[in-house]
């Protein structure tokens, strides 16, 4: 019989330690009790109780700081009142409570009990019995800890910072005290801890709400949203759970550089639904579509050639934007700012904020572009340029600039012409205009050509006098004797300046019958020499001379050819 009693007690003990049982399981427990011949309230032998068991006890005394509980062992247990804090209002002598057996006997021979450990054990058993990873539980956020928050779900669970919300968190303290639903992410049986997530539920709710809202949204309807993000290309709005994009081109009919010029974060906007992509969950929004499109009748309102006034609102390297009415801007390109000046920077002509009169040049309605002209409000001096500067007209102009290929002169403010290096002298080979001209000086020249379309005028200085090469054969007939000054010595001969500045060349082979090592042995720059004209080439502006021929025909070295000719006549 004792074995039977021991057996039945052991069974009853095992049943008592089953925690957090649902009602149907408790009924099953009572049935097992009856099968073994005892009731749930029957006294239990104390010899079998081991530390770690949860026992039912009776409150026998209550003081300010302690509660004394009798669990039927050889001594009573004293438990701090702080462990009954959640149930202290209903606590009274004679009340039945569950406690955890820490020790059957301490150093003083007393039983050590814990109400708090019993509660935690029951909570843990409840979690194991009723919950699993993925379960949804309700709890209250109680405090902030390193890396997240603590949530009371019947026991303490950890809510990582990354799982608190699906939006950016500024202050964790704002969440303390909130009662929310959480999803159990992980249950660690060995460590007896639970990790939960609020973000996953919020995200699931958002996705569900987004899908529902996507089905409800219709193109053309008006909706209110909150600005949640501003980018260079547009604004993202929260439409009560679904994000919509308000592109910068759909914000206003006028031109803006950045969306922040019109909106700010957390601002509420009423927008129009432009398009919905249900598969990708994208919604395009419009703000300017709430207003009349000023471009609808733009071609009738601003036909090409019409003069309008507007305000300069933006300057760029290539031109100036002018607002001619609310939402309508046009571009004055730098090439349309002046008839006569080569404008590099719009600031040379206009400033931001200036009010100016312009002429409509063209309209591209589909692209929302208007081309405007500033110079068209003034007379174009090139319209009658051919009448004002006919070919052959002699003019006096100021030299404004010298280049490698010529000199630019100003005929009148904004009207310039070019004297090409080849039109500077009939006889001199000019290497650079600076050999003849200086910037700022005035020069007389002749109009050679006028290109109205290209806005180009060419002038010449040498054309002021007759071309001496036209009379070269009369001036220096082949076979005649001439005199000149040596101006340059080269390896192939010596150049001699003749009448009217014309140069002739004495080739090295035509210098002397006598042998010489180098030309400088018989000639020096500045020497006056006499020679015979042996060849003329007017087309290439060349006169060929020979000292040898001069001497061979009776001339004398060092004798002036003019004197020789005179003596021969005598």
From Swiss-Prot:
GO terms for molecular function: mRNA binding; structural constituent of ribosome. GO terms for biological process: translation. SMART domains: S1 (SM00316). CDD domains: S1_RPS1_repeat_ec1_hs1, S1_RPS1_repeat_ec2_hs2, S1_RPS1_repeat_ec3. Residues 52-116, 134-199, 220-288, 305-375, 392-462, 479-548 form the S1 motif domain. Pfam families: S1. GO terms for cellular component: cytosolic small ribosomal subunit. Keywords: Repeat, Ribonucleoprotein, Ribosomal protein, RNA-binding. InterPro entries: NA-bd_OB-fold, Ribos_protein_bS1-like, Ribosomal_bS1, Ribosomal_protein_S1-like, S1_domain. Binds mRNA; thus facilitating recognition of the initiation point. It is needed to translate mRNA with a short Shine-Dalgarno (SD) purine-rich sequence. NCBIfam families: PRK06299.1-3 (NF004953), rpsA (TIGR00717). Belongs to the bacterial ribosomal protein bS1 family. This is Small ribosomal subunit protein bS1.
């Amino acid at each position: 019989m004792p074995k039977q009693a021991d057996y039945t007690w052991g069974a009853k003990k095992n049943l008592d330690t089953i925690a957090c049982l649902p009602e149907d399981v408790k009924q099953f427990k009572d049935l097992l009790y009856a099968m073994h011949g005892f009731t749930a309230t029957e006294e239990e032998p104390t010899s079998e109780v081991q530390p770690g068991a949860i026992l039912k006890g009776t409150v026998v005394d209550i003081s300010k700081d302690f509660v004394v509980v009798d669990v039927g062992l050889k001594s009573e247990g004293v438990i701090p009142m702080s462990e009954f804090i959640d149930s202290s209002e209903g606590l009274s002598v004679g009340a039945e409570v569950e406690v955890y057996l820490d020790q059957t006997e301490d150093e003083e021979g007393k039983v050590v009990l814990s109400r708090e450990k019993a509660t935690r054990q029951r909570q843990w058993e409840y979690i194991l019995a009723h919950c699993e990873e993925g379960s949804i539980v309700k709890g209250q956020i109680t405090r902030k800890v390193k890396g997240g928050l603590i949530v009371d779900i019947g026991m303490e669970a950890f809510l990582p910072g990354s799982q608190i919300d699906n939006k950016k968190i500024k202050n964790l303290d704002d969440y303390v005290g909130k009662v929310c639903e959480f999803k159990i992410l992980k249950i660690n049986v060995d460590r007896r801890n639970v990790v939960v997530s609020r973000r996953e539920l919020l995200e699931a709710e958002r996705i569900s709400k987004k899908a529902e809202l996507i089905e409800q949204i219709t193109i053309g309807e008006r909706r209110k949203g909150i600005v949640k993000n501003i980018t260079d290309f547009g604004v993202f709005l929260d439409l009560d759970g679904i994000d919509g994009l308000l592109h910068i081109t759909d914000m206003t009919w006028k031109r803006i550089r950045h969306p922040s010029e019109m909106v700010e974060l957390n601002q509420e906007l009423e927008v129009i639904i432009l398009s919905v992509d249900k598969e990708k969950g994208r919604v395009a929004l419009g703000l300017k579509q709430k207003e009349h499109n000023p471009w609808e009748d733009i071609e009738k309102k601003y036909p090409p050639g019409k003069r309008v006034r507007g305000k300069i609102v933006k300057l760029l390297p290539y031109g100036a934007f002018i607002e001619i009415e609310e939402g309508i801007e046009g571009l004055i390109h730098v090439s349309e700012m002046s008839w006569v000046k080569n404008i590099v920077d719009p600031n040379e002509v206009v400033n931001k904020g200036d009010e100016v009169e312009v002429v409509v040049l063209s309209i591209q309605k589909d692209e929302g572009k208007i081309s405007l002209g500033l110079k068209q409000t003034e007379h174009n001096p090139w319209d009658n340029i051919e009448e004002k500067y006919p070919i052959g007209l002699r003019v006096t102009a100021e030299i404004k600039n010298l280049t490698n290929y010529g000199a630019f002169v100003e005929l009148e403010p904004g009207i310039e012409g070019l004297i090409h290096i080849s039109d500077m002298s009939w006889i001199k080979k000019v290497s650079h205009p600076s050999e003849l001209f200086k910037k700022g000086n005035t020069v007389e020249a002749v109009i050679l050509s006028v290109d109205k379309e290209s806005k180009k005028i060419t002038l010449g200085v040498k054309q002021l006098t007759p071309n001496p090469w036209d009379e070269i054969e009369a001036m220096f007939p082949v076979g005649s004797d001439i005199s000149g000054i040596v101006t340059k010595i080269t390896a192939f001969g010596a150049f001699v300046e003749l009448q009217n500045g014309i140069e002739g060349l004495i080739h090295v082979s035509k210098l002397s019958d006598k042998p010489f090592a180098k030309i400088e042995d018989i000639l020096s720059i500045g020497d006056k020499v006499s020679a015979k004209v042996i060849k003329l080439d007017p087309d290439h502006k060349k006169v060929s001379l020979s000292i040898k021929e001069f001497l061979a025909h009776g001339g004398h070295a060092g004798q002036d050819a003019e004197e020789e000719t005179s003596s021969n006549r005598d």
